[in-house]
């Protein structure tokens, strides 16, 4: 047991350049995206994950943060986007099946149709690529679900630091 960690074995963290805006501009030229564009996007995501994250421990919990995950959670749970607050979605689970179902619905809609269904303008443009990243990542990790968190990684690092200051 690592000293001072209360039995924690360690946490895996990895940053990979798979931003939804960059991927949208690079791969999703049509509105709605064409099948070949979606296939190329998925292939790129898979290749990037295989190259940058060749190993990840099985059965580890996956925490999803950020706007795409929050929007997917809201869509699946019929939460209006203006009602997305940490108290409402933190700790909720999203399964791979639920994420892929949302992606399948969105990929056949135009940006305007996504906006009509409640996505804000900026998010509606990148949501398909963002959801594809989340889905492909869960597949890569052999994970069946993720836990939604509106706290981001920087906030988590700050909290860990502050807790260490208080107990150190």
What are these regions (language model features)?
Residues 3-168:
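Helical "lid/coupling" subdomains associated with nucleotide-phosphate turnover
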